[in-house]
Amino acid sequence: VTLHDARWRGFASDNYSGILPEVLDAIRAANGGHQSSYGADVYTQALGETIREHFGPHAEVFPVFNGTGANVVALTSMMPRWGAVICSSSAHIHTDEGGAPERVSGLKLYTVSHEGGKLTPASVATQAYGFGDEHRAQPMVVSITQSTEVGTVYTPGEIRALADYVHSKNMLLHMDGARLWNAAASLGLPFADFTTHAGVDVLSLGATKNGALGAEAIVVLNPDAVEGILYLRKLSMQLSSKMRFVSAQILALFQESVGITAATHANTMAALLRSTLEDRIAQGAITELAFSYPTQSNGVFAMIDLEVANRLRQKVRFYNWDESRGEVRWMCSFDTTEADIISFVDLIQEELQA
């Protein structure tokens, strides 16, 4: 029984969208009969082979339920109890995971300022000190997000520069890839070019935001970077007994460019939203709206009067990003349509002129 109005659309989150038809088909195909549990199934084996094809021969995959779980298990496996993570002040692990890294694993997070959502060797250096000082939690991992929390995308060169600096300090580089497909679509590059070959040690690979039902994974690119990850996944309650259904979802995104096609569409819709707004601004039809960051993936960040935003939100759902400066976030998904964009821009124009 369908309980919701399937015509209802929003720009709050790519998590609001449904499931890609190909992913639903993959779940159905994995159903029926018996398969070994806890990852000893043919779908998880096939996913491992696919991951190695895309990320290199040493890559190893560990499917989990959600992004917070992927980040917590990955980071915990990368350091001892006295370790600390350096991350952006806007990092998901710092702002949107309910304190899970600290509460579940006891990790210390050192936050640093960001430039358009990105870390640089210079910003990391502000917390990369005190090595060997027993009074200071030891910086051992740097975590970056690709694409970033504000919709920008690291280039391979930027990641390589970070990795070189991080490794020179005997630290490791973790990438939160909740929207990795959107980054790949934006860059037009194979995954390995901005992960494995750029010096990333461990990756949290997202799928849910790109059309999966509920599937993420930890991808270990440097086998020497983790310890005890199998046990940590279990004790962190991220080990699925019927893992074939998790693995099948991620596998479906890699087959026949399903994931890249979906992410490309979401990115294209975000670019259309921005360009349509820019056209209205140039025509003088929209005023008092400005953009916060470049639109490089599937999110548009804008500055708008919050009273106007609140009125808009009565008709179309979206989130405030930084209320202190009147910043909002508009996210596009694999199923966002051009009609959705035009209708939303018309509403923005109408409310700004009210």
Please place each PLM-identified region on the residue numbering:
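Conserved PLP-enzyme active-site core in the AAT-like
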Residues: 2-315, 320-336, 344-352
